[in-house]
């Protein structure tokens, strides 16, 4: 893969599989260690740039970097010169000049990660190519590491992804998670079904490698995995569905709907969950739910991504 991870669609099948395999290898390398430290990125500086609120993604990237012995520095809008009006470009160039090896960005603007990679790409000198850029979520565009950890969780639970039927349910329109999962899971050979009200499907979805349905119940009996999406009210201005109650009755994963799933099926959610709206608490806490497994896998996947963009070697340092 390239020295950046900007979109799930940029990953080949071999690239994605290598990251998933290395995520499993990192997890195994940490088993039994009293102190969870590997020397893999010793001497490297990783900077997280989060311009949107985050718990899971930010913490897992920080933990991933620290478990690999990198120096991890946090930059936020509130605590940096961004709060004084500094542009994203100037902040990026400052971090590049300061010697950052990797920039991990979450930003409300779609395409922000691509711009960051362009701005910091270096001056043509191969010894100074600029930092690697990892997209931790840009607007409604992409969230590639979330898709990777979802794929890893499905692979662990089901034994593989090829030929599996993955049903993605909810606010597809505003979901970068949905976009990245569609691209990655399709690349890995899964059959992807989108279930959403017509108002929460993006323009052009008919060109995606998916099947689209408005009938959640009809898709449950054949599902191998169900990925529930949060309704992103912060990106809406109203009018997408009549009421929370009606949305939940049509597109929420209730106990009744869980009973329609095959026994082997796995339930996923990228978080944060709106319990009682898109998913019942009893379902979220059930044995079919892999929500906490997703969080654990998030650390290992992000370790693998940092390894691939910064080192790119075949062997993980022990």
UniProtKB/Swiss-Prot annotation:
It catalyses: carbamoyl phosphate + L-aspartate = N-carbamoyl-L-aspartate + phosphate + H(+). L-aspartate binds at residues 84, 176, 230. One of its GO terms (cellular component) is cytosol. InterPro entries: Asp/Orn_carbamoyltranf_P-bd (IPR006132), Asp/Orn_carbamoylTrfase (IPR006130), Asp/Orn_carbamoylTrfase_sf (IPR036901), Asp_carbamoyltransf (IPR002082), Asp_carbamoyltransf_Asp/Orn-bd (IPR006131). Keywords: Pyrimidine biosynthesis, Transferase. Carbamoyl phosphate binds at residues 56-57, 106, 143, 146, 271-272. The keyword Ion transport does not apply. Pfam families: OTCace (PF00185), OTCace_N (PF02729). One of its GO terms (molecular function) is amino acid binding. Pathway: Pyrimidine metabolism; UMP biosynthesis via de novo pathway; (S)-dihydroorotate from bicarbonate: step 2/3. Gene3D superfamilies: Aspartate/ornithine carbamoyltransferase (3.40.50.1370). It comes from the Bacteria. Its EC number is 2.1.3.2. GO terms for biological process: 'de novo' pyrimidine nucleobase biosynthetic process; 'de novo' UMP biosynthetic process; amino acid metabolic process. Heterododecamer (2C3:3R2) of six catalytic PyrB chains organized as two trimers (C3), and six regulatory PyrI chains organized as three dimers (R2). Belongs to the aspartate/ornithine carbamoyltransferase superfamily. ATCase family. Catalyzes the condensation of carbamoyl phosphate and aspartate to form carbamoyl aspartate and inorganic phosphate, the committed step in the de novo pyrimidine nucleotide biosynthesis pathway. This is Aspartate carbamoyltransferase catalytic subunit. The lineage of its organism: Bacteria, Bacillati, Actinomycetota, Actinomycetes, Mycobacteriales.
């Amino acid at each position: 893969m390239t020295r950046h991870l900007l979109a799930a669609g940029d990953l080949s099948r071999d690239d994605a599989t290598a990251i998933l395999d290395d995520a499993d290898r990192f997890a195994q390398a940490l088993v039994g260690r009293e102190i969870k430290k590997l020397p893999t990125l010793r001497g490297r500086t990783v900077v997280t740039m989060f311009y949107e609120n985050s718990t899971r993604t930010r913490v897992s990237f920080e933990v991933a970097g620290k478990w690999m012995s990198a120096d991890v520095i946090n930059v936020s809008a509130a605590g940096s010169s961004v709060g004084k009006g500094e542009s994203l470009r100037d902040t990026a160039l400052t971090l590049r000049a300061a010697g950052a090896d990797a920039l991990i960005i979450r930003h409300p603007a779609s395409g922000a990660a691509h711009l960051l990679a362009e701005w910091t790409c270096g001056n043509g000198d191969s010894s100074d190519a600029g930092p690697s850029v990892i997209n931790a979520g840009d607007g409604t565009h992409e969230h590639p590491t979330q898709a990777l950890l979802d794929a890893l969780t499905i692979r662990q639970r089901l034994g593989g992804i090829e030929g599996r039927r993955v049903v993605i349910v909810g606010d597809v329109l505003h979901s970068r998670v949905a976009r990245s999962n569609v691209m990655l899971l399709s690349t890995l050979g899964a059959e992807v079904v989108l279930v959403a009200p017509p108002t929460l499907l993006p323009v052009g979805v008919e060109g995606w490698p998916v099947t689209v349905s408005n009938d959640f119940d009809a898709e449950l009996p054949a599902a191998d995995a169900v990925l529930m999406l949060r309704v992103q009210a912060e990106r809406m201005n109203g009018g997408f569905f009549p009421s929370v109650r009606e949305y939940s009755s049509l597109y929420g994963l209730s106990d009744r709907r869980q009973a329609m799933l095959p026994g082997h099926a796995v339930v996923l959610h990228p978080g944060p969950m709106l319990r009682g709206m898109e998913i019942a608490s009893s379902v979220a806490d059930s044995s079919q739910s892999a929500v906490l497994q997703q969080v654990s896998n998030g650390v290992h996947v992000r370790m693998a991504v940092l390894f691939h963009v910064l080192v790119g070697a075949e062997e993980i340092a022990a």
